[in-house]
Each structure stands twice: as C-alpha cells, then as structure tokens.
Amino acid sequence: MMRFLVLAGYFELTIYLHLSGKLNQYINMHYSYLAYISMVLSFILAVVQLYIWMKQVKTHSHLNGRLAKVTSLALLAIPIVVGLTFPTVSLDSQTVSAKGYHFPLSEGTDQAIQTSEGTTSQYLKPDTSSYFSKTAYEKEMRTAADQYLSQDSIQITNENYMEVMEAIYDYPDEFEDKTVQFTGFVYNDPSHANSQFLFRFGIIHCIADSGVYGLLTKGNTRQYENNTWITAKGKLVNHYHKELKQNLPTLEIESFTKVDKPENPYVYRAF
C-alpha cells in the first residue's frame, strides 16, 4: 500500500507542478515531455502496486527488515513532501550577491574559487561546450554567430537569449558595434558605482545547472535598484573589467524602459 501511495504521490506532484505553472522553475521546458512521461509511468506503476496490494500477490524484496523498508519509502517520499509543501522562490540579484562578486567560469578568474565552492555554476556566459566535441561546438557556435551577425539589429528574446549571449562571449570582437536589445533584471556592480549588469537566470537542463547570464552596461542615465526589470537597447563594446581582469562585452545603453517582471523570469537553452 505504501508503494502505491508513493507512486501516486509522484503522479500528483507532476500534475501539481504543471497546473500551478511551477514546472518551468525546475527544468528546461524544452524537456517538459520527460516530466509527462514520468507522470504516466508513475500512474501505471501506482496502478500495478494497487493491484498487487488488493490481490495480496507475493513479491520478492531485497530489503530485509522493517526499518530498511520504512527508510527506503521515507527517502522516496521526501521529494514529494518538499515539492508540495515548500514555497518556490525565484532566483534574483540576491542570489548573485550571496555567491559573492566573482564569476568562477570567467576567463582569468582563479579556478580555485570554484573548486573550493564545490560548484560548476555558470556566470555571465552560457557554456555548452561540454555537451559537444570541440569541432562540433565550434561549428555550432559559428553558425549561430553568423546568423545574428547578419542582422542590422539583434533582438534578444526569451527563445534565443542564451544562444545569443554565448555567441557574443565567444566572438566579442565580431559583435562589437552591433546594436542589441534585451530585457533583464538589474544587478548593481558593487565595485563601480555607475555600472550595472543586466541579467537573466538561465537553465540548460534543470535548476541544478542554472546560471546568471547577461551583459555589463554603461551609459545609464538612471541608476536602478537591484531586481528592477528593464528593456535596454544599445551598442556592444569591449570593456576591460579590472576585478575580473578581462575584457567583457558591454552594452553602451542608448535607450531603456522599465518593465514589469515577466511571468516566467527564466530563459532556457535550446539544442
């Protein structure tokens, strides 16, 4: 009976996340079909377990002892309890501040920082190179970069956000002087009073590999507070950042508009 309840719980959890609109805060929505497959499988297995319990079918178990069985079921029930009872919190500039002002995957940054944190979190630039061979990655990004370089003005949307950002950081010199427009939340650079980053939190596969991606901005005529959402338009230049000890693609802002926070603040990488 307990196995049926646990499996039914996973089925109900997936339905809850879907109907409440919270599923997009846990996984890349391009892979949402996997969640639906797991939901169907959970339902089928729950029905099987209900049948076994009602018919008193003898089954073999590798778990010897009541404590082992209870412990295994309790561990399986933890995700259900967490998913149904814990509040969902959107990542924002407080998350960036909590990690400290350093970007572990930026070129020239001490990699020992990342090792000591035990994290592979990505900052500024999305990096999908680990999912391709070197040749395949270079070909993929070259094709993407050429697509956007051919445009007079690059409109960065929810759909292409991570692809464009990765291309900009891979080919900063080629994108210099290109006009771009995108929406993100403000993160004030604690090292420079008049500098602000414009970020979006992006998910490659699931929330575990999420990172904060965007551009340093210059030329703001108004200083916004952290977590203020704006749409900015301007030209890309390469700016040397002393703290990161590297050139960063930077948006020289020509116009900006304060906007409401999107219903879904996350962006996703499409492959």
What kind of region is each of these model predictions?
Residues 46-48, 52-102, 106-107, 111-114:
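Transmembrane alpha-helices and immediately adjacent membrane-cytoplasm interface residues
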Residues 38, 219-232:
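Short nucleic-acid-contacting surface segments enriched for D/E, G, S/T with interspersed K/R
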Residues 180-186, 227-236:
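OB-fold and OB-like beta-barrel modules that bind single-stranded nucleic acids
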Residues 192-203, 246-250:
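Short aromatic-glycine-enriched beta-strand elements
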Residues 209-222:
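Beta-strand/loop nucleic-acid-binding surfaces
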Residues 89-172:
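Membrane-interface segments at or immediately adjacent to transmembrane helices
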Residues 241-267:
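OB-fold/S1-family single-stranded nucleic acid-binding modules
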Residues 3-59, 67-68:
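Membrane-embedded alpha-helical segments of integral membrane proteins
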